[in-house]
């Protein structure tokens, strides 16, 4: 019998990225990992807090992505915060590099997930939000929640 595909298995999301940045564009990239790191990601022992992407030469790397060491690993000890290479096309790297050089723009990892058995990372091109932008977003979110509550209460009666 064929195995059901329930969509991608999301291991970690970077919620602060959506709060601190306007996400202009997103890209899907593969990650160069060791075997024990893949096992840890499958167990959702990965954190994207403070992670960022930097392009060095013609390669993209993710820094500060914390992957807990797999506790049953006996072969080699893996550093949890090591830099990991992202697998992107040359065209995508050039595009990201050009946009990242603009003042106020940065490349941020948004999600780590599995797609067809392969570990992927969703990378976003972000522009930093100002304090008033963040306050605006919070006000809009609160207003929409209140409107939904009022609407639900009207339907009940």
Curated annotation (Swiss-Prot):
GO molecular function, one term: RNA binding
Protein name per Swiss-Prot or TrEMBL: SsrA-binding protein
Domain of life: Bacteria
Family statement drawn from the similarity comment of this UniProt entry: Belongs to the SmpB family.
Source organism phylogeny: Bacteria, Pseudomonadati, Elusimicrobiota, Elusimicrobia, Elusimicrobiales
GO CC annotation, single: cytosol
Function field: Required for rescue of stalled ribosomes mediated by trans-translation. Binds to transfer-messenger RNA (tmRNA), required for stable association of tmRNA with ribosomes. tmRNA and SmpB together mimic tRNA shape, replacing the anticodon stem-loop with SmpB. tmRNA is encoded by the ssrA gene; the 2 termini fold to resemble tRNA(Ala) and it encodes a 'tag peptide', a short internal open reading frame. During trans-translation Ala-aminoacylated tmRNA acts like a tRNA, entering the A-site of stalled ribosomes, displacing the stalled mRNA.
Swiss-Prot/TrEMBL GO biological process terms: trans-translation
SUPFAM superfamilies associated with the record: Small protein B (SmpB)
Organism: Elusimicrobium minutum (strain Pei191)
InterPro entries the UniProt entry points to: SmpB, SsrA-bd_prot, SsrA-bd_prot_CS
Subcellular location: Cytoplasm
Alphabetical UniProt keywords: Cytoplasm, RNA-binding
């Amino acid at each position: 019998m064929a195995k059901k595909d329930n969509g991608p298995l999301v291991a970690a999301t970077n919620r602060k990225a959506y709060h601190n940045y306007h996400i202009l564009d997103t890209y899907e990239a593969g990650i160069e990992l060791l075997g024990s790191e893949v096992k840890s990601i499958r167990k959702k022992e990965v954190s994207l807090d403070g992670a960022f992407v930097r392009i060095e030469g013609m390669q993209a790397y993710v820094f500060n992505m914390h992957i807990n060491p797999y506790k049953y690993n006996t072969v080699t000890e893996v550093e949890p915060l090591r830099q990991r290479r992202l697998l992107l096309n040359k065209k995508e790297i050039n595009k990201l590099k050009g946009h990242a050089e603009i003042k106020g723009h940065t490349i941020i990892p948004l999600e780590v997930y599995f797609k067809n058995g392969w570990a992927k990372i969703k990378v976003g091109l972000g522009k930093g939000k100002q304090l008033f932008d963040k306050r605006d977003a919070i006000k809009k979110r609160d207003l929409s929640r209140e409107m939904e509550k009022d609407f639900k209460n009207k339907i009940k009666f």
